[in-house]
């Protein structure tokens, strides 16, 4: 074990990799079932209608439709509003 550090060494210079968290699909955007809507740590956004929550609190679409953000009891909710079926 050296009693002195080598020339030009430093105990600094480390940082964790960015986790790419945040909202991935915004209000009004069309999404398919399974698409990730929000990546988060903790429940900053809560799952609403047709939205599921993963083990790491990621919110994802359960059905195809449009993304809608709302507030309910001071909680930010993410919902999926299903598209109306058009008869052809």
UniProtKB/Swiss-Prot annotation:
| One MF term in the entry's GO annotations | structural constituent of ribosome
Key words, A-Z: Ribonucleoprotein, Ribosomal protein
Which residues lie within the region annotated Disordered? 1-25
Polar residues bias spans: 1-13
Q: Name one GO biological process term.
A: translation
Record InterPro entries: Ribosomal_bL27 (IPR001684), Ribosomal_bL27_CS (IPR018261)
Look up keyword Zinc and say if it applies: no
Name the GO cellular-component terms.
cytosolic large ribosomal subunit
The family note in this entry says: Belongs to the bacterial ribosomal protein bL27 family.
In terms of PANTHER family, this protein maps to: LARGE RIBOSOMAL SUBUNIT PROTEIN BL27M (PTHR15893:SF0), RIBOSOMAL PROTEIN L27 (PTHR15893)
Q: What is this protein called?
A: Large ribosomal subunit protein bL27
The major lineage groups are:
Bacteria, Bacillati, Actinomycetota, Actinomycetes, Mycobacteriales
Provide the gene name from the record.
rpmA
């Amino acid at each position: 074990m050296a009693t002195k550090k080598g020339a030009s060494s430093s105990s600094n210079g480390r940082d964790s990799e960015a986790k790419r968290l945040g909202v991935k699909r915004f209000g009004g955007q069309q999404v398919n079932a399974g698409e990730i809507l929000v990546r988060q740590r903790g429940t900053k956004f809560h799952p609403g209608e047709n939205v599921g929550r993963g083990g790491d609190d990621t919110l994802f679409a359960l059905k195809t439709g449009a993304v809608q953000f709302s507030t309910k009891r001071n909680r930010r909710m993410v919902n999926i509003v299903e598209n109306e079926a058009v008869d052809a």
